[in-house]
Amino acid sequence: MEKALELREKIVEIVKAKGPVLPVQVGKEVGMSILMASAHLAELTASKRVKISNVKVGGSPLYYFPGQEAMLQKFTASFNDKEKKAFDLLSQNKVLRDSEQEPVIRVVLRDLKDFALPLNVKYNNNQEIFWKWYLTTDQEAEKLIKTKLGIERPEEKIKKEEKILAND
């Protein structure tokens, strides 16, 4: 029992040190089969000590430590053209309005679970889906969504700031 806990701690340290890893890499490091390494990684994922990606490399998911999400971008080379287009569009714009996207992009965004976070926004009794780039802060996303909805335009914000400064 103690040996299994020691082994899990070693696996956690490997994931922490190497970033997103495949079960085969962990297996080689600790000298066990891919199947056993996968089982230990699954247990660590269930206990929320390690995260699992939706991105697959050769059919295997990547395992990573909380805070290493940005490192998942290294594994997007295997994306097909549609996935790459949606990935690039979202990474450049930070927030996308679902209803403004081409149907193929809308479908792909739903599959890019590691990078595209859905936000259900209620506005004027309507509910809309927006997609947030996974590294975008909630505050930044809120500003961008408000701009897209016409709640606050960048010019209005500048004018508000000018008025505040003029009153000082």
Residue ranges and their predicted role:
Residues K85-D168:
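Exposed, interaction-prone assembly regions rather than primary DNA-binding/catalytic cores
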Residues V26, L41-R49, L90, L112:
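Basic amphipathic alpha-helical segments that dock to polyanions
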Residues A17-V30, G59-F65, A70, A86-V104:
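Short acidic, hydrophobic short linear motifs in intrinsically disordered regions
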Residues E6-E13, K85:
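Pre-recognition alpha-helix immediately N-terminal to the DNA-recognition helix
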Residues M1-R8, L22, N54-F79, L109-F115, ...:
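Short, cationic-aromatic polyanion-contact patches
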Residues K16, G31, A42, A46:
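Residue-level detection of the helix-turn-helix DNA-binding "recognition helix"
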